[in-house]
């Protein structure tokens, strides 16, 4: 048994030595023939997957990848390469010849002959030639074109040239006259007109036609409103930043800008503290109790009830003071209803005379007052002058207020305009070079805020997405109980 086992081992060892002729470039490259492969079912996908995941399958993949790498880099396997390709004979140190100094022109020409790095990166460094595409070298209608070339060669010998060659020769003999290119003066002198001008030349054919017809057929231009000729704000489109925002500002300008930014932050903190103070929860000492809530609810009710009690007590004591019979006035509501008696002629004459006398007295009083107004003419003039001066003062105040608010953004929507933060850098962040300067702000955000400040668009906020619930279909019970 032992001898047989040794014989089998010698056969296996000799087979391994015969198969191991592979030289790998990587230190992990191992000849797969040195390992004994495990047997397993290969007629199912499970066996294929297991074979690929086993160490032997991984080594086979690594072996094939190493073979491809050698073919790409050296043009073949290292085991098959001759000794002259792998080794060289060292004959000793070679003495370098002194290099001649090159002129600037020679250096420049050599630099121009040297290929660029981008071209070297795009070159094919693989030793394996690319597969030849036969279709790329095929020419459609090659036989037809070859016959046509033979025909034209035969005609050229007879002195007849193709049509395109004859046209080219004719163009050379009689070249076309070059067209004059329009210069800058021609472009400036080109007629132009104002689109909103009332003397528009395009409206000349429409003069004398029916205005209603032109309006209905959309041939009449839209009249530009006068308000569109006025700018909504006098703020310049591009504002010059303060001197302290420069990349190399003076000490005074930078400190002034820092002070301005500091005041803005202080104002913002005050508003935040005020809001927090208003929304703060009360302490245990300030918390409302049941007694304080009841006292607040009864506030004002107890005083009114006390006054009513005193008033009722006074009314109740009045009949006790006079024990006699109380006389009720004839006009009182508690007395018997009085019958309306017919007026006599004498009473009617007296009432008519009294009315006439009152009218005469009112007319005399108005005439007397009008006569007295003549003596108050100087006072009236002074009063009118004071009123006119007051109106002029108010008018001037409104004009000054409008001028002061001309540069301020108006409220165009439900949101107020919020000024952007001041772009400022601390003293430690300043740099004397534009290359190392830390960027501040954003050009798109700056333009958007400029539109809002100049009253061209309203202040906006980010749209809030509303949650949409899934539609749920419910069948009513009365409908569900109906069975057909």
From Swiss-Prot:
Modified residues (N-acetylalanine): 2
Keyword rRNA-binding: no
Main location: nucleus
Entry keyword annotation includes Transcription: no
Intrachain disulfide bonds: none
Any one GO molecular-function label of the UniProt entry: identical protein binding
Annotated region (Mediates interaction with human herpesvirus 8 protein ORF16), positions in chain: 348-392
Keywords: Acetylation, Nucleus, Phosphoprotein, Ribosome biogenesis
Biased composition, class Basic residues, residue ranges: 35-49
Residue ranges, annotated region (Disordered): 1-51, 304-356
Record PTM: Ubiquitin-mediated proteasomal degradation is regulated by c-JUN. It is associated with relocalization to the nucleoplasm and decreased homooligomerization.
Entry's Gene Ontology BP terms: cellular response to hypoxia; DNA repair; mitotic G2 DNA damage checkpoint signaling; negative regulation of phosphatidylinositol 3-kinase/protein kinase B signal transduction; negative regulation of proteasomal ubiquitin-dependent protein catabolic process; negative regulation of protein-containing complex assembly; negative regulation of signal transduction by p53 class mediator; negative regulation of transcription by RNA polymerase II
List of residues that carry Phosphoserine: 29, 305
Renumbered residue ranges of the record's region Mediates interaction with CDKN2A/isoform tumor suppressor ARF: 148-437
Gene Ontology CC entries for this record: cytosol; fibrillar center; nucleolus; nucleoplasm; rDNA heterochromatin
Chain spans, region Nucleolar localization signal: 353-401, 402-484
Signal sequence annotation: none
Basic and acidic residues composition-biased segments: 336-348
Consequence of gene disruption: Knockout embryos are not able to form viable blastocysts. Transgenic mice lacking the expression of Nop53 in the thymus display a dramatic reduction of the number of thymic cells and of the size of the thymus.
Top-level taxon of origin: Eukaryota
UniProt subcellular location: Nucleus, Nucleolus; Nucleus, Nucleoplasm
Matching InterPro entries: Nop53/GLTSCR2
Family from the record: Belongs to the NOP53 family.
Assembly notes: Homooligomer. Interacts with PTEN; regulates PTEN phosphorylation and increases its stability. Interacts with RPL11; retains RPL11 into the nucleolus. Interacts with CDKN2A/isoform tumor suppressor ARF; the interaction is direct and promotes ARF nucleoplasmic relocalization and ubiquitin-mediated proteasomal degradation. Interacts with NPM1; the interaction is direct and competitive with MYC. Interacts with NF2 (via FERM domain); the interaction is direct.
Role this protein plays: Nucleolar protein which is involved in the integration of the 5S RNP into the ribosomal large subunit during ribosome biogenesis. In ribosome biogenesis, may also play a role in rRNA transcription. Also functions as a nucleolar sensor that regulates the activation of p53/TP53 in response to ribosome biogenesis perturbation, DNA damage and other stress conditions. DNA damage or perturbation of ribosome biogenesis disrupt the interaction between NOP53 and RPL11 allowing RPL11 transport to the nucleoplasm where it can inhibit MDM2 and allow p53/TP53 activation.
Protein name: Ribosome biogenesis protein NOP53
């Amino acid at each position: 048994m032992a001898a047989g086992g040794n014989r089998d081992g010698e056969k296996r060892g000799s087979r391994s030595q015969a198969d191991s002729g592979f030289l790998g470039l990587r230190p992990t490259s191992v000849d797969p023939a040195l390992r004994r492969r495990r047997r397993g079912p290969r007629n199912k996908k499970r066996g294929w997957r297991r074979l690929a995941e086993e160490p032997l399958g991984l080594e086979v993949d690594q072996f094939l990848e190493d073979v491809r790498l050698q073919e790409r880099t050296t043009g073949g396997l290292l085991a098959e390469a001759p000794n002259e390709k792998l080794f060289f004979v060292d004959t000793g140190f070679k003495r370098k010849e002194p290099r001649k100094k090159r002129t600037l022109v020679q250096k420049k020409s050599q630099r121009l002959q040297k290929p660029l790095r981008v071209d070297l990166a795009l070159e094919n460094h693989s030793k394996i030639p690319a597969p030849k595409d036969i279709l790329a070298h095929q020419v459609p209608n090659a036989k037809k074109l070859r016959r046509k070339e033979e025909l034209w060669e035969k005609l050229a010998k007879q002195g007849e040239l193709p049509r395109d060659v004859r046209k080219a020769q004719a163009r050379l003999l009689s070249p076309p006259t070059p067209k004059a290119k329009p210069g800058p003066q021609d472009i400036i002198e080109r007629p132009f007109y104002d689109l909103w001008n009332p003397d528009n030349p395009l409206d000349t054919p429409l003069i004398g036609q029916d205005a209603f017809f032109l309006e209905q057929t959309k041939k009449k231009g839209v009249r530009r409103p006068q308000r569109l000729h006025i700018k909504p704000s006098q703020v310049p489109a591009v504002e010059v930043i303060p001197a302290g925002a420069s990349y190399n500002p003076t000490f005074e300008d930078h400190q002034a800008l820092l002070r301005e930014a500091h005041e803005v932050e202080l104002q913002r903190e005050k508003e935040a503290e005020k809001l927090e103070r208003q929304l703060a929860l009360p302490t245990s000492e300030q918390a409302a109790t049941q007694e304080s809530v009841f006292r607040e609810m009864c506030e004002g009710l107890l005083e009114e009830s006390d006054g009513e009690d005193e008033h009722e007590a006074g009314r109740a004591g009045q009949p006790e003071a006079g024990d006699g019979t109380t006389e009720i006035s004839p006009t009182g509501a508690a007395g018997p209803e009085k019958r309306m008696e017919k007026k006599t002629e004498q009473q009617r004459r007296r009432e008519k005379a009294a009315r006439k006398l009152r009218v005469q007295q009112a007319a005399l009083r108005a005439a007397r007052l009008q006569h007295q107004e003549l003596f108050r003419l100087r006072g009236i003039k002074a009063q009118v002058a004071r009123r006119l001066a007051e109106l002029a003062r108010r008018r001037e105040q409104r004009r000054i207020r409008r001028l002061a608010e001309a540069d301020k953004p108006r409220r165009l929507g439900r949101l107020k305009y919020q000024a952007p933060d001041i772009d400022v850098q601390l003293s430690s962040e300043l740099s004397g070079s534009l290359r190392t300067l830390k960027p501040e702000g954003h050009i798109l955000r700056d333009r958007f805020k400029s539109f809002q400040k100049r009253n061209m668009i309203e202040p906006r906020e980010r749209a809030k997405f509303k949650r949409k619930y899934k539609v749920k279909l419910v069948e009513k019970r009365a409908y569900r109980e109906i069975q057909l």
